[in-house]
Amino acid sequence: MQTEQLISQLFDGQHLNQEQIQQLFHYIIQGQLSNEQLAGVLIALKFRGEQTDEISGAVKAIIANAKPFPFIDYPFADIVGTGGDNANTINISTTAAIVAATLGYKVVKHGNRSVSSKSGASDVLNALGIKIDLSAEKSKQALDNLNLCFLWAQQYHLGFKHVAPVRQILKTRTIFNILGPLCNPARPKHQLLGVYTPHLLKIYAESALRLGHQHSIVIHGSGLDEVAIHGKTDVAEICHGKIEYYSLTPHDFGFTPKPLETLRGGTAEENAKILTALLQGKGKDEHNQAVAMNTALLMKLFGNDDIKANAEKALNIMANGKAFETLNQLKLYQ
């Protein structure tokens, strides 16, 4: 009865407070809603617009129901986007995570299969021969030894299986595109978070702040949930309990703008070849630039404020092929 009351409130256009949404999402993750009820909830939230209370409450419910990940006693970050920008770009965040790890920064990348593009993080990792469903213990070992591990959302959030069929049928952005990046089971307090619309910047930053993030950056890059090589990137930076809003262009990273079309990706297999070329120092200039710019902001979360210098370091580590060694070492974890 309580579930029906909460759903009814949503259908009436009412906002749920954090406690109410946390309760509703507990029921969702436990599989207590029918597909029809769940589709109704997702559509109602989408058309009415999600609020900070709802996002933070839903994240808390999902994390509370997740399989645990070993405690990490050193600084680490995540780089992840909401997806749903329908740009079908190459796998920039995944490549940036490998580059940052090669530079010595600890990265726990949380990812899933694609919902609205051809190749999500898990899709391309599979194509590269990387085991995406490693045990939590082996993933922690990879993080300890290689500065990097990938956590597959479906392995830790078993309740997502109740949601996946409805998301596939709807084939559109839902609150789960918004929630996913904030639900890393390692519970990072430092994240580079890409969002598919500038309208999400403020609400996403406020949600991250409410969830206890120490230093995170939310970005929207002229239509992308990545730093833009083709124009302006809007930024909301959470640091020391405050949110600062500003914008960046490729010039701030030491580059000139490039056409977005140069970042078009393909299937997981095609994107895996592009990613491999990048890490071997054989990538296209535009691809190198995109990865370097995103890596530069990721490095900022570790206290490296000079993003132009950060981007140059990222370019150099790709050029010398050391990042490809990191990829090969990661393949050994089975």
Curated annotation (Swiss-Prot):
The EC number(s) attached to this protein equal: 2.4.2.18
Q: Which cofactor does it need?
A: Mg(2+)
Positions with a binding annotation for Mg(2+) 1: 93, 226
Q: Where does Mg(2+) 2 bind?
A: 225-226
Q: Which residues form a coiled coil?
A: none
Do the record's keywords include Transferase?
yes
* GO-annotated cellular components: cytosol
Instruction: Say yes or no: keyword Metal-binding present.
Output: yes
Give the NCBIfam families listed for this entry: trpD
Q: What protein name does the entry list?
A: Anthranilate phosphoribosyltransferase
Q: Which organism is it from?
A: Histophilus somni (strain 2336) (Haemophilus somnus)
